[in-house]
Amino acid sequence: MSKFSLKLGSKTLKKNISKKTKKKNSLQKANLFDWDDAETASLSHKPQSKIKIQSIDKFDLDEESSSKKKLVIKLSENADTKKNDAPLVEYVTEKEYNEVPVEEFGDALLRGMGWESDSEQDSKGDKTQSRNKDVSNVSQIHPDGLGIGAKLNKAINVEEASFMPVVKIDKITGTKVDDDKKNKS
């Protein structure tokens, strides 16, 4: 049996550790992914229904008065089982899947991405004309290099009005140097 001490303020708390707790610690440090080890196979994976807490009052730090209060928090079975038993995803039946037409799904996707179509032409029955019109505008709305929702920056297409050419000046003489004269000499 080994001892350890914990100093809180001016009082010291001494605790004895038995061999049983050492075995628990060795089980906790064991590799859970090593199935050859017999100790890890004996670990149970049941959900905890109780959490035990030992409370030590500041007045009970002496060894003589070893009255530790045991607090037990019981988890409600209803809340615990409801969380584990409830399905996470509701599945769509084949009947519900077949009820949604693909055309409406695609239009909904485009509307979600900010695509605006002429609702007046769609209601008249000229769907083919409006779709052809929308497809022809794709190259204007989405130039190369931009994503679906990206907006074209107007400053990119504007050419600068002023042009300043690069002039080479000889450091020694301080005169302008033409490329033709420098290459000939």
From Swiss-Prot:
Bias kind Basic and acidic residues: ranges: 121-134
Regions annotated as coiled coil: none
GO cellular component: cytoplasm; Prp19 complex; spliceosomal complex
GO biological process, one term: mRNA splicing, via spliceosome
InterPro entries found in the cross-reference section: G_patch_dom (IPR000467), Spp2-like (IPR045166), Spp2/MOS2_G-patch (IPR026822)
Cross-referenced Pfam families: G-patch_2
Quaternary data: Belongs to the CWC complex (or CEF1-associated complex), a spliceosome sub-complex reminiscent of a late-stage spliceosome composed of the U2, U5 and U6 snRNAs and at least BUD13, BUD31, BRR2, CDC40, CEF1, CLF1, CUS1, CWC2, CWC15, CWC21, CWC22, CWC23, CWC24, CWC25, CWC27, ECM2, HSH155, IST3, ISY1, LEA1, MSL1, NTC20, PRP8, PRP9, PRP11, PRP19, PRP21, PRP22, PRP45, PRP46, SLU7, SMB1, SMD1, SMD2, SMD3, SMX2, SMX3, SNT309, SNU114, SPP2, SYF1, SYF2, RSE1 and YJU2. Interacts with PRP2.
Function: Involved in pre-mRNA splicing; specifically in the final stages of spliceosome maturation. Promotes the first step of splicing.
Assigned protein family: Belongs to the SPP2 family.
The protein's name: Pre-mRNA-splicing factor SPP2
Gene symbol of the encoding locus: SPP2
